[in-house]
């Protein structure tokens, strides 16, 4: 039994050492830079770049979609703005048609109606190939933006070396359940520690889908690779946000984080949907980490530590916990060194975060340690063993009745015809889709916050 005790103690000690170094450097690099922020020196619509906002939606609730579109319509942006809402074969299209009609008189809005569900990636591409703006902003349909988000992201993108930039994510339903409160804190840590530290070196590893802006010229050069991503000979059907970010870095572009560009998104309020979401994210993270490894020699050494900390850390923690549980099962003695080290690290981290964020609620993030150890670590192990599985888990393909699968239906309210009006059929244009139905895939609609 001494072997189990030694294994648990050594593993947790290595985990503590690695986490202390990694989280310590992350805390330093995530501090706001001391240089003065760039001034808003662009005055007049002619100087601001044109922006195309792309919003893929699938079975989104009418109220949620309406809130999303309202936040886009009310952006305080002096440049040219176009909005492409892509209905990805929703089964509730009749319920959201009135929402489309509300924007029929706004020349900035275009609606693309896909006859069947093809996934977020192909829904995005359908709009990207139709759009023409200097910058492309991807927004999830359950997300609302602060009124200055587009302006702040566009200002960051003034540097031509930057290929992508993301805003800060918060949970719109934070107060609903204990789980949504934890997820909101998880988002804060992911944005203001992990992404902020990565952005110090211009290498945010995942620009999250709810609010991510891309340079159109950079995006177009990578579009074919993005569309045809394969894993073990199969189309990769989720994790598009992380993969597109990795492609940007591989092409030599910087990826940035803008903390004061606030996007509010809906998060899972029950454990089942949360764990299914985490399983998708874990699979996509493992897949694209393999691609990211070849980028590390050209990036700052902190990014290597970041990858090691995020992958080796959970492995050491899992080893210490498994050995500790085995020790308890076989000897009825508690692995006190492991318990005390994990408890101390949890208390220290939550206290430091609470002081830094100036929010006492982060003390309650201690509860996340139990979720991490007993739910997320086993889930990540399962994800690693099932990397080839591309099931969306919470979403099934929907085909609209009587829809022609070879067509994209584009309803353009610019012509003054709402998609729900009796004359809308006359305003519809049809374009052939690929005949190979195997190219129609499902994709994840949320980014990884980890």
Swiss-Prot record:
Q: Name one Pfam family in it.
A: Glycos_transf_2
Any one of the GO CC terms? plasma membrane
Q: Which UniProt keywords apply?
A: Cell membrane, Glycosyltransferase, Membrane, Nodulation, Transferase
Task: Say yes or no: keyword Ion transport present.
Answer: no
Q: Which GO terms describe its molecular function?
A: hyaluronan synthase activity
| Main location, first listed in the record | membrane
Q: What class of enzyme is it?
A: transferase
Q: By its UniProt entry, which InterPro entries does this protein fall under?
A: Chitooligosach_Synthase_NodC (IPR026463), Glyco_trans_2-like (IPR001173), Nucleotide-diphossugar_trans (IPR029044)
* Stated family: Belongs to the NodC/HAS family.
Protein name, please? N-acetylglucosaminyltransferase
Gene name for this UniProt entry:
nodC
């Amino acid at each position: 039994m001494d072997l189990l005790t030694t294994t648990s103690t050594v593993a947790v000690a290595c985990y503590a050492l690695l986490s202390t170094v990694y989280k310590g450097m992350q805390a330093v690099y995530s501090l706001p830079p001391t240089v003065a922020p760039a001034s808003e020196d662009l005055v007049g619509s002619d100087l601001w770049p044109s922006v195309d906002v792309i919003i893929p939606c699938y079975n989104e609730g009418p109220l949620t979609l309406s809130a999303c579109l309202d936040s886009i319509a009310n952006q305080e942006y002096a440049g040219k703005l176009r909005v492409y809402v892509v209905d990805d074969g929703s089964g509730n299209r009749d319920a959201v048609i009135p929402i489309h009609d509300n924007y029929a008189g706004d020349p900035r809005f275009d609606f693309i109606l896909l006859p069947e569900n093809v996934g977020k990636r192909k829904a995005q591409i359908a709009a990207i190939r139709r759009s023409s703006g200097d910058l492309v902003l991807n927004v999830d349909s359950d997300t609302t933006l602060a009124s200055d988000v587009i302006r702040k992201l566009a200002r960051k993108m003034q540097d031509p070396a930057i290929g992508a930039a993301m805003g800060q994510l918060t949970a719109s339903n934070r107060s609903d359940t204990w789980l949504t409160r934890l997820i909101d804190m998880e988002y804060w840590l992911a944005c203001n520690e992990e992404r902020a530290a990565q952005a110090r070196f211009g290498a945010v590893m995942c620009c999250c889908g709810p609010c991510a802006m891309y340079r159109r010229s950079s995006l177009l050069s990578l579009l074919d690779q993005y569309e045809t991503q394969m894993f073990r000979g199969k189309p990769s059907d989720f994790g598009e946000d992380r993969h597109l970010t990795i492609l940007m870095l591989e092409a030599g572009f910087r990826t940035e984080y803008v903390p004061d560009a606030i996007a509010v998104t809906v998060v899972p309020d029950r454990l089942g949907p949360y764990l299914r979401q985490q399983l998708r994210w874990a699979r996509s993270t493992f897949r694209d980490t393999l691609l990211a490894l070849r980028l590390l020699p050209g990036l700052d050494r902190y990014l290597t530590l970041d990858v090691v900390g995020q992958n080796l850390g959970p492995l050491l923690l899992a080893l210490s916990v498994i050995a500790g549980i085995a020790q308890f099962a076989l000897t009825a003695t508690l692995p006190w060194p492991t318990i005390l080290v994990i408890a101390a690290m949890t208390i220290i981290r939550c206290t430091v975060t609470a002081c830094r964020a100036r929010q006492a609620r982060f003390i309650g993030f201690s509860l996340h340690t139990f979720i991490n150890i007993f739910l997320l670590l086993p889930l990540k192990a399962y994800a690693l063993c099932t990397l080839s599985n591309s099931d969306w888990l919470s979403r099934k393909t929907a085909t609209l009745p009587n829809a022609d699968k070879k067509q994209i239906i584009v309803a353009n309210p610019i012509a003054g015809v709402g998609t729900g009006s009796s004359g809308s059929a006359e305003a519809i244009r049809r374009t052939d889709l690929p005949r190979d139905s195997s190219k129609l895939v499902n994709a994840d609609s949320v980014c990884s916050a980890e």
